[in-house]
Amino acid sequence: MTRIKRGYIARRRRTKLRLFASSFRGAHSRLTRTMTQQRIRALVSAHRDRGKRKRDFRRLWITRINAVIHETGVFYSYNRFIHNLYKKQLLLNRKILAQIALLNRSCLYTISNEIKE
């Protein structure tokens, strides 16, 4: 019988895994089994946090808008401000409103005066 030599597929797979895990600490970057487990954990965390990042930014924008509104006493609350925006059909999302609140407060005051009941 002729000798069958091992292929390169498993080695290539482990090399790819090693490159992915090269920045991990300790055995997580050296041992194949722990590298595999850590890779799965890293990808799970990345997937989860992509959704979480969207929620976090939305919370930040709402907090910034609310802070400027309360500082000036323009409206009673953020809630009423957004409600009046929708009633007047002004299409400004929270990200844009937060940028306006930070960079150009007088513009936000003008918007609030426009939508007052």
Curated annotation (Swiss-Prot):
CDD domains: Ribosomal_L20 (cd07026). GO terms for molecular function: rRNA binding; structural constituent of ribosome. It is found in: Plastid, Chloroplast. Keywords: Chloroplast, Plastid, Ribonucleoprotein, Ribosomal protein, RNA-binding, rRNA-binding. GO terms for biological process: ribosomal large subunit assembly; translation. One of its GO terms (cellular component) is ribonucleoprotein complex. Its main location: plastid. InterPro entries: Ribosomal_bL20, RIBOSOMAL_L20_CS, Ribosomal_protein_bL20_C. NCBIfam families: rplT_bact (TIGR01032). Binds directly to 23S ribosomal RNA and is necessary for the in vitro assembly process of the 50S ribosomal subunit. It is not involved in the protein synthesizing functions of that subunit. Belongs to the bacterial ribosomal protein bL20 family. This is Large ribosomal subunit protein bL20c. It comes from Draba nemorosa (Woodland whitlowgrass).
